[in-house]
Amino acid sequence: MRSSLIAAIALVALAGCGRITPATVTDPAEVQRLARITVPPSAAGLQCRTECGIDPLIYGRFYIPTADLRAVLDRMPKDCKIEPYSKYSNVTSHQMSEPWWQPGQIREPQVAEWSEPGFSVNLMFGEAGQPGILTVYFFNFGL
């Protein structure tokens, strides 16, 4: 009897060690709430996933007309600046498994990164395809 109980506990523990597929978020309002960024009504191609580990994580991508970038950055603190990408960003330092996660395809990427109490916002954006359309990647997490 005792060996059956130990085997059952071991089986449950091993089942919990498998890879869990990140949850998909499709509602722009929910993405805004979780990522703490604005997703403009003009956004297209929204992809978003969440993971819960030691720190909650939300990452994704969408396309916007260049003129709508200001709306995406509306929560950025005034003392933060848009910077040219200098070969490091929380966006590019993480290799996500989704086929749409390709920040390396952005030409002349720029980044905007800031923290607020208990949360880090990390954006990378630039043109990757059609002129006048920006691809915006975000990789945001709890601290």
Feature annotation, model-predicted:
Residues M1-I9:
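N-terminal export and membrane-targeting signals
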Residues W114, S120-P131:
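Short, exposed beta-strand-loop hairpins at the edges of beta-sheets
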Residues A13-G16:
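C-terminal motif of bacterial Sec signal peptides marking the signal peptidase cleavage site
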